[in-house]
Amino acid sequence: MTDEEEAEKHYHSGLPGILGTIDTLISKLEAIILALGVLLMATNTVANVIGRFALGESLFFTGEVNRILIIMITFAGIGYAARHGRHIRMSAIYDALPVGGRRALMIVISLFTSLVMFFLMYYSVHYVLDLYDKGRILPALGFPIFIIYVWVPLGFLITGIQYLFTAIKNLTSRDVYLSTSVVDGYKDTETEV
């Protein structure tokens, strides 16, 4: 097991007090949701393939279940990516700055991104409520379609919280952090372009 996998398994937030507890709890919840989502999607897809080729019948609900799982994995995954500093960043100007400038810029970036995530959460809640009002249902599974989109505002909320925590971590630390647990820097395996 690599150091990165070991750190992932025993994640502990670098934030103080209740913020660290919340961050660690959200991290564990995200890991469970993502692992279960991927396993369920794989199981569902394999069962459908076996059913189609061995029995000549596809499972009627496979497409809808995989659609639900894709939405769940995507929006649980954005918070996970932010937590582990796995997001896309444009670093030409950022890398040219001294440590203090990088930390200040990371605080601004984190706060702005957090606000954008909360803004998107606000509008996605309205979208889910609109779907609820329309009363649409999934044809194969027969339950209301708004339920599968509840993951969208939850994902934006968790990601917004994570970026807010990153800003707090940078405000309370001497180092520059990409997330609450990832210090800025390049590993030996990464190359600068």
Curated annotation (Swiss-Prot):
Quaternary organization: The complex comprises the extracytoplasmic solute receptor protein TeaA, and the two transmembrane proteins TeaB and TeaC.
Alphabetical keyword list: Cell inner membrane, Cell membrane, Membrane, Transmembrane, Transmembrane helix, Transport
Gene knockout outcome: Deletion abolishes accumulation of ectoine from the medium.
Cellular compartments annotated: Cell inner membrane
Gene Ontology CC annotations of this record: plasma membrane
Keyword field contains Flavoprotein: no
Topology of this chain in the membrane: Multi-pass membrane protein
Pfam family, one: DctQ
Regions crossing the membrane: 33-55, 65-82, 103-125, 145-167
Role: Part of the tripartite ATP-independent periplasmic (TRAP) transport system TeaABC involved in the uptake of ectoine and hydroxyectoine in response to osmotic upshock. Probably functions as a recovery system for synthesized ectoine that leaks out of the cell.
InterPro entries: DctQ, TRAP_DctQ
Stated name of the protein: Ectoine TRAP transporter small permease protein TeaB
Assigned protein family: Belongs to the TRAP transporter small permease family.
